[in-house]
Regions:
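Catalytic cores of peptidoglycan-degrading enzymes
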Residues: 19-141
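Non-catalytic extracellular/periplasmic "stalk"
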Residues: 1-20
Length: 141
């Protein structure tokens, strides 16, 4: 049997957008990461001013957009090539489930929602449903 997490599988009628597999940093001009993945922390915390646009790291389809007790306002993108990315603690989302987005498109805005202490974008990356470190994809950050 196939096991999926609710909200992470394309629904009937949704068209998958396949990403390039080449990622861009989701918060341009903000390079400071206060915390990388490790010790129970699942992503990179990119410090930025409240309301700063958050960009899709690659093209794909929005598979989740909503509220989570820990993530606050968040968006998840399926890039259709085994990769998924998740962006959390947004002040607001700019997309909805089922939307097809292009690399560099605004998907939301930096905030401080959910289990958060200060404005930042929490950024997670997955390959074949396994969590991977953004530090390996962006070694110069």
């Amino acid at each position: 049997p196939e096991i999926t997490v609710t909200g992470t599988k394309l629904k009937n009628g949704m068209i998958a957008k396949v990403g390039s597999g080449s990622f861009i940093w989701p918060v341009p001009n903000y390079k400071y990461v206060s915390r990388w993945m490790g010790n129970g922390h699942r992503g990179a915390d990119i410090c930025a001013a409240y309301g700063t646009p958050i960009l899709a790291s690659d093209s794909g389809t929005i598979i989740a957009a909503g509220w989570h007790y820990s993530y606050g306002n968040y968006v998840e993108i399926d890039h259709g090539n085994g990769y998924k990315t998740l962006y959390a603690h947004m002040s607001a989302q700019a997309v909805h489930v089922g939307d097809v987005v292009e690399q560099g498109q605004v998907i939301g805005y930096v905030g401080n929602t959910g289990n958060s202490f200060g404005n930042h974008c929490h950024f997670e990356m997955y390959y074949n449903n396994a969590l991977i470190s953004a530090r390996n994809v962006f070694p110069d950050m």
